[in-house]
Amino acid sequence: MKVRASVKKICNNCKIIKRHGVVRVICKEPRHKQRQG
């Protein structure tokens, strides 16, 4: 899980979703998981 100021899609499988006001990237590649902080 990377915590970043700006989250971006890294590959085509990445999806940007918003959970409880937190922007997240979910992907089948575990290294691509991100969260905005």
From Swiss-Prot:
Q: Which InterPro entries does the record match to this protein?
A: Ribosomal_bL36, Ribosomal_bL36_sp
Top-level taxon of the source organism: Bacteria
Q: Which GO terms describe its molecular function?
A: structural constituent of ribosome
Keyword terms? Ribonucleoprotein, Ribosomal protein
This protein's record includes keyword Ribosomal protein: yes
| The keyword Transmembrane helix belongs to this UniProt entry's keyword annotation | no
Q: Which GO terms describe its biological process?
A: translation
Q: Which HAMAP family match?
A: Ribosomal_bL36 (MF_00251)
Query: Which family, according to the similarity comment?
Result: Belongs to the bacterial ribosomal protein bL36 family.
Q: What is this protein called?
A: Large ribosomal subunit protein bL36
What organism does the UniProt record list as the source?
A: Ruthia magnifica subsp. Calyptogena magnifica
